[in-house]
Structure formats: structure tokens, C-alpha cells
Amino acid sequence: MPIPTLSIAALAQLPTTVLTPSYTPKHTTIGIVHLGAGAFHRAHQAVYIDDLLAEDPTWAICAVSLHSPRVRDALRPQDGLYTLALLDEHPQLRIIGAIRELLCAADEQPAVLARLADPAVCLVTLTVTEKGYCLAGDALDLAHPDIAHDIAHPAAPRSAIGYLVAGLQQRMRNGIAPFTALSCDNLADNGTLLQRAVVRLAEQNDRALAQWIAQHATFPRSMVDSITPATDDALRAHVQDQLGVHDAWPIQRERYSQWVIEDRFCNGRPAFERAGVTLSEDIAGYARAKLRLLNAPHSALAYLGSLLNLETVADAMGHPELAAFVETLMRDDITPTLQPMPGFDPQQYIDAILARFRNPAIRHLLAQIAWDGSQKLSVRLLGTIGDALAAGQPIQRLCLPVAAWLHFIRRQAGNGAALVDPLGEELSDIGCSTTGDAGHDIPAFLTVDAVFSSLSADARFVQALEHSYAALSPGSPAHVQSALSE
């Protein structure tokens, strides 16, 4: 007998131990468009909205994938429902019903543009990763292939920025108030960067539109936090065993979740505070602390742990020297670069993060965290190094994860393995040319201006990076262990 598929009709058949929506999903209406319907959105923002829909059913989500139809094809037959597995010492399964519509922009572009122009849509949220903003430094990269296409074909965009501009243009023409565009990606000052990118793209074809956006639309900054490992076959099997129905794409995350949003909305908003969201006038301090004290150590664990042939974050935290190094890095090197915040205790925050990293129920693969290093390290580590240099603070420990990333590139290139990174081809070419000698290799890597332009001319940084690279060479576990113990 075939196993039934998760759907609204199947909700009544689920075990009572499974949490299900406290509202009727069919009775909700769409008020939010989300660009980038990946696992993090479905584990984070959609869960907060799910908590609010019983009270206000007008904020359901249209989830848009910009390129791949996989999420749409998996969840549309399930009425948008999916399972969230909350992982800790008391694991729990929950069905999320906040997504009422799923679209793929690659083959449903008119529907996406129509939804962005819908007067009922008052909020557009984004999780498109750092590379999805098509930035060069802090500004929109007009030479980026997708942006160049969107300038030439503004009514048929490819990029997330292009879709926002096209949607806002249609609203302006129709006399409809703009939506709030809310970035939920790990970018420092993400709302400001998004606003600059949208206005700059609009300026290329329609200066009146750019002015209207600048005057009337808002782009709040936000900070998001919850560790969300990739879905694997073990999760799919566990969910099916527990539910008795088939879920094509369940997701998992730790129980801890945080969302801080700058309270700056131009067209109404959900009652976020009732779902546990922190609304603040200024979130820069929260965002910086998270990027530097959580995301930067995550990257350190990913690259150093990979060189030690470890598989998961929990495995890496079980390595005594690596765990001690990361804790010292957070306490002695990163914390001094943060500005004091009322009510914020750095040591308590560090202790909580380390406990989350050690959670054995979370199989967060180091290989997944290692993706897109060229985009991540600039905001997670290199800015911290720049601030430390400006303050006359030591940077040697901060440079070790950067050097580990370079050895990771070298190893991937030497093994003929693909590098998952927007600059993968350029970095792999450099990796193939390396010898393991710091004096030869570091100058070659420093030519990648998109990563190192702000630091490559600083002799203190170059010297510290060369020292760390040499200490790790040739990238074997024994040399990594020795470098961690220095």
C-alpha cells in the first residue's frame, strides 16, 4: 500500500505527538513574498509567521525560488506543508503551514512579478545568500552578468535585486504603495546594502523610480540566527517513520532561534513581537556580534576542521585543541572588536554559542559551512582583522582560519574537487599553482581583490597571514594540530 503524501487533508491522520497548525491553512491569504525559498527561510522566518497566522491570517507567504524548481516541485503537491524537526535533547516534529504558494521564477516569471505587484503584499523578505546581492564591495556590481541582463531587460529580471526593482516599478505605475524589503541574510548592515543596490539598479533605467523608492520604500536591517543543517536521507526516513506520511522535503534546525529587526516598515507589518521577534531602532550591534562571534567561529571550525578530516561542527568541538582555539579566538581576539551594548554580556553569548556548537543532535556538516568562502570571510573575519589592526590589537590567531581557507582551496584544487564558491574557478586556478611555500602562495592569493583588497597592502596582515599559512603547511592534520597549539 503506497504511503500517503503530507497534505492539508492528511493533517488529521498525523500522530498527536506532532505539532500541526493551529489555524486552517486554506483560510490564509498572502501578504508576504519571500525570495530564496531555501531551508533557512523555511526553518526560520516561515516558522515565526506560522506562529502568527492563527491571530492574523493575512500574512501567509508566497515562497519564490529564483532558479531551481526543486522546492516548488517538492512542496506544491503537499499544499505547501512541510515538517520542521527541532533537534535537542527533546526532539520535536512540527508541521509548518505558513507557505500558501510556491513559485519558481525561472519558469513562472509572470506569476512572480504579478505577486510582487499585488496590493495585498506589503512585505518582501529575502534569503538569497551573500552572493545573491551581486555586490562589488558595498555597491551593486553593474558588470555582474545577472545585473547587466536586468539593466538591458528590466521587465524580465534574473537577480533578486532585479525582481525587487521590477515589482516596485509596477507598483509605482499602478499607484500602489511600495512594499518593505527585508533582507534576512548574514550581511553586516544588510538593509542598507539592499537599499543601495535596489536604488542603483533602478537609476540605470528610471531615475523617477529610483527617487520614489528612496523616498517611500523602506529596507530594515535584520539579524537572524538558528543553525540549520542540510536535509539528508536520515531525516527524511525519520520523519516518514514518525508521521506515517511522505514528506518530500522536511527540514531540521536547532531549537534556538533569534530574529532581530529594525522597526522601519513602510506598509504595515505582522505583529512580529508576539512571535518572539525583537524589534529595535538600531540592530547594528546585534548583527555585528552575531557575525563575528557565531559566523566567524563557524568558518574557523569549517576550514580547520576540514583539514583535520572532521565531518561536523560537533565533531570539531570534540577536538580539544580546536575547541580551545575557537573559544580563545572568540574571547580574546573577536570580543575586543565589538562595541559595548546595554544588556549584552559577551561571555554569556560566547558560552551559549559554544553549547550550541556542541549539540550532538545537530549534524551540521563542515563541508556545507565551507561553501562560498570568498563571500563569507570578508564579512565574518576580514573586517574583524581590519578593526583589530586599526586598534593596534594582535591578529595572529584571527589569521589562522583565513590561512586554513587557503589551504582548503589548495587541497580541493590538488584533488581535482570542485570549489563551491562564486570565485571558484579563479581560486582553484590559484590553488593549482601553489607550492605550499607561504612566500610564493600568499602573494598569489592576495591578488583576489574581491576578497583581500582592503588588507592586501597592509604589511602587518601579509606577515601574519604568511606566518599562519606556513604553520599549517602542507595542510596535514599533524601540522594543523601543531599550529593550534602555538
Which ranges hold each PLM region?
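Substrate/ligand-engaging "lid" and interaction regions
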Residues: M1-E486
